[in-house]
């Protein structure tokens, strides 16, 4: 009798463990959302398996990769654990392709300031258009995927962060990009890992943006922490954006790492996951109006370069 009881107990325990493992399994599906000449654009959807059977609509994280508009992958292995973390937290995660317009351009064509400025603007415009098409695809499948189209959060790393921020900037200024999306659509929030906004002259916001979470190192020589301007065209980084958000009294979470370079384009996906969840739960889903700034200081870093020129940024991005 005792042996039988122990056997039953062990069987129940194994069944319980198997149930937990099954519940935590992440389902991944891949879809083609656009074909543009030679480019077939796809997106990957990640959702926790036990949520597929639910009836409640879920918020979405729409992620776009980094790579200097020259390369990068939506399924970069370094991103996957971040996607799974968010999926287990109750989000549907969508990682999307976009056309990387700088990959086939001869570097000699944008080695000077004007050439670089023009090529970069074209690459950003192209990436943002594709990001909008991915957004539309999600909205069109919102019922089938059981997601809430009013709770789509844009997220990106480096070039992807520029793309996500630029998309929000275009919506707020009611440009032609906004016409590609449903009327009155806006993202519920934006999470930017070392991003910036591209604008001719100082950025102006006709409408206030959604809550923004900005990660940036003040020693970043790839994407400007504050700004990099060529005549009128400029890249306006997280620090400048945050100053504007303060003036507009718009909710934000700004994470500054002093003495740190472009590693903030990926490290928060591992090191700041719970900060990200706090932003999502409070400022995005909870609609709390908060102005949060966190400054990370490393006492071992006392002297570092942060006053980069536009030539420095071009040199770094041509590697």
Question: Which residues does each PLM region occupy?
Answer:
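The feature captures the conserved acid-bearing segment of alpha/beta-hydrolase catalytic domains
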Residues: 178-249
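Primarily recognizes the serine-hydrolase "nucleophile elbow" in alpha/beta-hydrolase
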Residues: 136-208
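Serine-hydrolase catalytic-loop signature spanning alpha/beta hydrolases and amidase-signature enzymes
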Residues: 68-71, 93, 137
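Short amphipathic alpha-helix adjacent to the substrate-entry channel of hydrolases
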Residues: 74-96, 103-105
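Alpha/beta-hydrolase active-site loop
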Residues: 113-144, 237
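N-terminal cap/lid segment of alpha/beta-hydrolase-fold proteins
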Residues: 23-56
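Short beta-strand element of the alpha/beta-hydrolase
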Residues: 56-68
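C-terminal catalytic histidine-bearing segment of alpha/beta-hydrolase fold enzymes
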Residues: 246-319
